[in-house]
C-alpha cells in the first residue's frame, strides 16, 4: 500500500471481522473512528483504509455488514465475504448458541450508520449519539483552530464555551487514548495541548 499524499510505501493491519465478545478493543476502536487507520511513516498523514467489515455480537444477536462504496465490490464478492465471515463466526460459537441471526446480517451503506446501530444496541439513545457527534465535530474544529493560532482557538472556545464540559473532556481523553493505541502520537500530542 502507498500513502495517497507522498506515495511512500506503508504497512498496515486491516480488520474485517469484529467479534465484540472476543475483541472488545476492536469494538472500542470502531466506535472511536480509529479502526483501520494507518499513519504514513514518511509524511505523518493519517489514512483511513477502506475494507469490508462484519460486526458480530453474540450476546445481543447482532450481525452487521458494511462495504465501503469506494471498493466497488460486486454482489458475488460481497456474498462470498459475508459467507466466509459467517462460517468463521459460526465455527467459533458454542454448539448450543443461537445462529439464525447470522444468516441474514443487516447491511449498512455507511460506517457511521453501523456505528450508530452498535451504540443503539448498547442502549445509547439517538440524542446521545448526536451529542457525541457534535462533540467530535467541535474537537476537530478546535484542533484546526489550534493549528491556526491562539487567537482563532480562543474565539472558537468562547463561541462554544457551554459545550466544553465533562463529557467534552471525556471525549478528548478517549481520542487521546485511541490515537496512542494506533501509534498517532502527533495527534495525541495535539489533543493533549488542546485539553
Give the location of each predicted region:
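Short, non-ligating residues that shape and space the ligands of small metal-coordination modules
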Residues: 9-13, 49-50
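Short metal-coordination and nucleic-acid-contact micro-motifs, chiefly zinc-binding Cys/His arrays
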Residues: 1, 8, 33-36
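Short cysteine-rich clusters marking metal-coordination/redox-active sites
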Residues: 3-6, 40-43
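Domain-exit/linker segments immediately C-terminal to small folded modules
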Residues: 42-119
Amino acid at each position: 500500500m502507498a500513502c495517497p499524499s507522498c506515495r511512500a510505501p506503508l504497512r498496515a493491519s486491516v480488520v474485517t471481522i469484529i467479534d465484540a465478545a472476543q475483541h472488545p478493543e476492536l469494538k472500542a476502536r470502531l466506535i472511536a473512528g480509529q479502526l483501520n487507520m494507518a499513519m504514513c511513516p514518511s509524511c505523518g498523514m493519517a489514512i483511513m483504509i477502506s475494507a469490508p467489515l462484519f460486526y458480530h455480537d453474540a450476546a445481543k444477536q447482532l450481525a452487521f455488514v458494511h462495504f465501503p462504496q469506494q471498493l466497488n465490490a460486486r454482489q458475488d464478492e460481497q456474498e462470498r465475504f459475508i459467507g466466509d465471515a459467517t462460517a468463521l463466526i459460526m465455527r467459533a460459537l458454542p454448539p448450543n448458541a443461537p445462529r439464525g441471526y447470522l444468516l441474514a446480517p443487516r447491511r449498512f451503506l455507511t460506517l457511521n450508520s453501523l456505528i450508530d446501530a452498535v451504540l443503539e444496541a448498547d442502549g445509547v439513545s439517538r440524542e446521545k449519539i448526536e451529542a457525541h457527534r457534535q462533540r467530535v465535530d467541535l474537537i476537530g474544529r478546535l484542533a484546526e483552530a489550534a493549528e491556526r493560532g491562539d487567537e482563532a482557538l480562543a474565539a472558537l472556545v468562547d463561541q462554544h464555551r457551554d459545550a466544553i464540559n465533562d463529557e467534552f473532556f471525556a471525549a478528548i481523553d478517549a481520542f487521546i487514548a485511541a490515537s496512542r493505541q494506533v501509534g498517532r502520537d502527533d495527534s495525541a500530542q495535539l489533543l493533549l495541548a488542546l485539553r
